[in-house]
């Protein structure tokens, strides 16, 4: 039999098996990202008439959302963007998750660069007829991802130390200015959010805004396989405003995503 990873089957080591599994998983993720383009009927507008730039797979996502008064959040959003409301208020979300299979179009996922942990803090905006996401901050455990996203998408990425094991996720910004701790698990079965519901408003978003509201990047994914979640969350210095009341929790096990290059807005 042929050797694998430079060893014969008899001497196949656990480390070699892990490396082989990682390689296989990266290509499985890449195939799933491409397949996401086969399902488009749920989109609020057509796919861009140009090639996407980047693929990602997101894993073990918690969506934690707080009601925030519109007037409290409005000063933290560029004037060129409309701060959206649903069920009588604006909403601020925090989402911890794992990025896997990160790759540029036509390029295989690169070891050590394709997987990392991330926490984003966001709200929901629109310009014209395009509802999307505005990020207050994005904390990532990969310095390379932080630098690339800052440069290309002009997003407020920050480098953080992130420890994630099973149901636990802990993030500490490298500069010491902010921390986040969560324990969470899914409850019930996964299903897409129904149109015209709060859940649909919070998760079914197909573009992001960057720069000072001067850039927009389209994204695409299948409808979110959303579940209810039970969680405890403690954050310090991540949200730009004081958070009050109990958050809403939702969970998704996985999502395959493609992202287009940003375009300048008029």
What residue ranges belong to the model's regions?
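Extreme N-terminal basic, low-complexity initiation segments
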Residues: 2-11
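Short amphipathic alpha-helical segments with coiled-coil-like heptad repeat character
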Residues: 3, 80-85, 131-132
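Short linear/disordered segments characteristic of secreted peptide precursors
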Residues: 11-14, 264
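Hydrophobic, proline/glycine-rich low-complexity stretches
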Residues: 25-103, 248-266
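Active-site-adjacent core segments of small-molecule enzymes
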Residues: 32, 43-44, 108-111, 115, ...
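A glycine-rich, hydrophobic loop/mini-helix early in the fold
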Residues: 86-92, 99-138
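Internal, well-folded beta-alpha domain core
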Residues: 120-266
């Amino acid at each position: 039999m042929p050797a694998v990873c430079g060893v014969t089957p008899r001497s196949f080591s656990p480390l070699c098996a892990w490396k082989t599994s990682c390689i296989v998983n990266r290509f499985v993720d890449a195939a799933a990202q491409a397949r996401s383009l086969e399902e488009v009927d749920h989109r609020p507008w057509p796919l861009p008439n140009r090639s996407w730039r980047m693929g990602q797979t997101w894993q073990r996502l918690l969506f934690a959302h707080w009601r925030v008064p519109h007037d409290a959040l409005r000063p933290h959003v560029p004037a060129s963007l409309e701060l959206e409301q649903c069920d009588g208020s604006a909403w601020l979300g925090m989402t911890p998750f794992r990025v896997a299979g990160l790759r540029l179009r036509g390029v295989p996922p690169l070891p050590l660069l394709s997987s990392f942990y991330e926490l984003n803090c966001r709200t929901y905006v629109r310009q014209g007829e395009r509802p999307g996401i505005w990020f207050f901050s994005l904390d990532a455990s990969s310095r390379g991802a932080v630098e690339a996203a800052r440069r290309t998408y002009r997003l407020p990425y920050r480098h953080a130390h992130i420890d994630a094991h099973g149901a636990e996720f802990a993030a500490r910004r490298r500069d010491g200015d902010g921390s986040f701790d969560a324990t969470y698990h899914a409850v019930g079965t996964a299903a897409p959010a129904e149109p015209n519901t709060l859940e649909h408003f919070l998760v079914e978003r197909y573009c992001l805004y960057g720069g000072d509201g001067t850039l927009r990047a389209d994204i695409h994914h299948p409808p979110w396989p959303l579940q209810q979640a039970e969680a405890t969350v403690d954050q310090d210095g991540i949200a730009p405003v004081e958070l009050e009341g109990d958050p809403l929790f939702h969970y998704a096990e996985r999502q395959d995503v493609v992202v287009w290059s940003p375009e300048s807005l008029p």
